[in-house]
Amino acid sequence: MSDPKESAAVASLYNTYPFPPEPILDEPPPGYNWRWNWQAAYSFCTGQKPSRDNIRILDAGCGSGVSTEYLVHLNPEATVVGIDLSEGTLAVAKERCQRSEQLEPN
């Protein structure tokens, strides 16, 4: 988006209505999905085992942190960074990860 008014309107919408509107739990996220594990996804896409363990994952457009929480939970060796246009939605993502013990409070 190059129109500042449009960007501000989108940010305002997501500040008011963080997405996705999933409940915030006081525990790690439930279940397992191979798509959230970088090694499984890498192997699926390339047909090879990853050659290294130290990895950085960018969750661009992380929204309320549902995907970020799974990425951190299923990839404890990785550095995971979530970014989003909406400060309000990022606050929800941070709370989600802190409450599920996936993020150290700062």
Swiss-Prot record:
Q: Name one GO molecular function term.
A: methyltransferase activity
What Gene3D superfamilies does its record include? Vaccinia Virus protein VP39
Q: Which Pfam families match?
A: Methyltransf_31 (PF13847)
Q: What induces it?
A: Present in both red- and green-light-grown cells.
Gene Ontology CC annotations of this record:
phycobilisome
Q: Where are the transmembrane segments?
A: none
Ordered alphabetically, the record's keywords are:
Antenna complex, Phycobilisome
Write the protein's name: Uncharacterized phycocyanin operon protein W
- Name its species: Pseudanabaena tenuis (strain PCC 7409)
